[in-house]
Design a protein with these regions (language model features):
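An active-site-proximal beta-strand-loop segment
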Residues: 1-21
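Active-site beta-loop-alpha junctions of metal-dependent nucleic acid enzymes
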Residues: 2-6, 23-46
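Short, solvent-exposed amphipathic alpha-helical segments in soluble enzyme
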Residues: 13-16, 39-41, 68-69
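Short small-residue beta-strand/loop micro-motif enriched in glycine and branched aliphatics
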Residues: 19-24, 76, 101
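Short catalytic-loop micro-motif centered on adjacent basic/acidic residues
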Residues: 23, 50-54
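Loop/turn elements at helix/coil->beta-strand transitions in domains of secreted/extracellular proteins
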Residues: 47-48, 72
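RNase H-like two-metal-ion nuclease catalytic core shared by retroviral integrases
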Residues: 54-56, 61-64, 69, 76-99, ...
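C-terminal domain-tail junction helix/linker
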Residues: 101-155
Length: 155
């Protein structure tokens, strides 16, 4: 996901089964920055990461480094076939609720990105039986109680 003036980008990763999202800021869309961000995001989840599907952009030129670092298989979508990475495209669309296309990402902090990602990872999804991506990915149940204000509060 790229910002308005193409100076800052967000690398987004989506886990297929749980719909769990990870995202990090990178300066531009250069291969070394993207590679560092992907490995930094996935290193804590190395045991759960077996395959990745990337688009054919130059930003993934260092894909072999990612594969070795994370001991994962890398696949590439066909050129101009964004539907082969539908979950990632959908995740980018959900993130656009917080960071719209006309927005300069240069003023956005990593904490703000993480806040938006956390909101999405704790949003119940119909496809997951109204569980959250966080619950499915980590195998934990988060209980929500109804407050007198009519909003759900986390216990």
């Amino acid at each position: 996901m790229i910002g308005k003036n193409h100076q800052i980008a967000l690398v987004t990763l989506a886990e297929r089964k749980s719909r769990y999202i990870l995202a990090a800021q990178v300066p531009g869309k250069h291969a070394l920055g993207v590679t560092a961000a992907v490995t930094r995001l996935l290193r804590p989840h190395k045991g759960k990461c077996y395959t990745m599907t990337f688009d054919n952009g130059k930003k993934f030129a260092e894909h072999e480094t990612i594969a070795v670092e994370l001991d994962a298989d890398i696949y590439f979508a066909h050129p101009c076939h964004s539907w082969e990475r539908g979950l990632n495209e959908n995740s980018n669309g959900l993130l656009r609720q917080y960071f719209h296309k006309e927005m300069e990402l240069i003023g956005v902090t990593q904490e703000q990105v993480q806040w938006a990602v956390d909101r999405l990872n704790h949003r119940p999804r119909k496809v997951l039986g109204f569980r959250t991506p966080f619950e499915v990915f980590f195998g934990k149940t988060v209980r929500y109680t109804k407050s007198p204000l009519g909003v759900a509060l986390r216990n």
